[in-house]
Amino acid sequence: LQHEDGHSHLMAMTIPTCRAYDPAFAYELAVIVEEGINAMFVRGEECYYYLTVYNENYDMPALPGEHVREGIIKGVYPFKTVTPDGAKHEVQLLGSGVILNEALRAQQILADKYKVASTVYSVTSYPELK
């Protein structure tokens, strides 16, 4: 557990064999761990996984479907879309780890107060997006 550590993923990007992830939900963590075991022990890839996990207490949804697995491993997938009646504008919101909850709160404010449509993306790994 590393409190207020905002730079470890930046440092991990400098190591070619390191795959760094910042999951928001337990199902994301499970998918990443399963992929890590397959990569390192089944396929014999020269890599290791760096995972950040948190101790903040919040609801953990179930895996929304098999369709999100690829996005979790590749680093990003759409988590939730909201389109209020009369929406004329649309934004994309990104979040990882516990910050994803703040993106979801922002999504609700944008919909309720400003009638702005949005999609929240769960970014499980910014480094894997490169």
Please name every model-derived segment.
Residues 25:
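Ferredoxin-type iron-sulfur electron-transfer modules in oxidoreductases and energy-metabolism complexes
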